[in-house]
Amino acid sequence: MSNKVKEIAIIPNLTKDSDFFATNKIAELAHANGVSAIIDVEHADKVKYAKGASFEQLKNAQMIIVLGGDGTLLSAVHRFSDTNASFLGINYGNLGFLTEIEKDMTDSFIQILNGDYGISEHLTINININGETYTALNDATLHRDAVSSMIKFSVAVGGEHLYSSSADGIIVSTPTGSTAYSLSAGGPIVDPTIDAVILSLICPHDLNSRSVIVPKGKEIMLTVTSAVGNSAVNFDGRIAVNVKTGDVLRINTGKKIKLVRVSDSFFYKRLKQKLF
């Protein structure tokens, strides 16, 4: 368990908390428990117990509080990708696999503020395309155009050719993302404490294809051998980059993102709650 929290940065949800009721509740609970709260300057006048702060100040807070579902948390991780802060997701969404506590969170939130919580570290992947590097916490998906034929590509691991494929695409997933799109494509569920990357084909032409788990430290190289239309790579289902024939994706493991957890066995409890 960690030490008592000294400062939190609150990332408001302008869609699901448009009246700032939940944001004010979080700031008020922090104030009542001796914890400073900061929020972006633009919305500081809407939150009584939070001070306005710059992006750098938000990024350097001890803990970043995110209101919403898994998608909102992923967006915050992308926005603050180089932070050393821990992320706490408060679930106002649907599935809530990454978020830790529900919106009626008073007791659990006070517990966390007083230092009674754990940290789980989640591997990210860095994807380099044509000199630009992108980061994903869940997955990177190379996929065909919506109206085109299959995309063709080759896969190499650690400099060694593994296979060539014609498919609707391929998902390169972290263990955290193994319960997301990769799972829908038939990929395995991988405990997030395992440092590995999962390769799962999407509707491959070869029906004998199987997912492959690659250990941390081995570079994965995807070479696009045939792509038409708006074939693209998506990162965590949000950022999209178009690709063309001849493009090469170099994928390596990146830094770890810290998520706040109330329970040490959160992963298997969440599996039981959400999937079984």
Model-derived regions: residue spans:
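Catalytic core of DAGKc-family lipid kinases
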Residues: 95-168
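A residue-level signal for conserved active-site and pocket-lining positions in enzyme catalytic cores
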Residues: 13, 65, 69, 91, ...
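ATP/NTP phosphate-donor binding region
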Residues: 1-63, 103-118, 128-134
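Short glycine/serine/threonine-rich phosphate/pyrophosphate-binding segments
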Residues: 19-20, 71-76, 179-184
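Redox-cofactor binding/interface segments in oxidoreductases and associated redox assembly factors
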Residues: 10, 66, 172
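ATP/nucleoside-binding phosphotransfer catalytic cores, i.e., glycine-rich phosphate-binding loops
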Residues: 134, 142, 147, 157-161, ...
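Glycine-rich phosphate/dinucleotide-binding loop and adjoining beta-alpha-beta core of small-molecule
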Residues: 67-92, 99-102
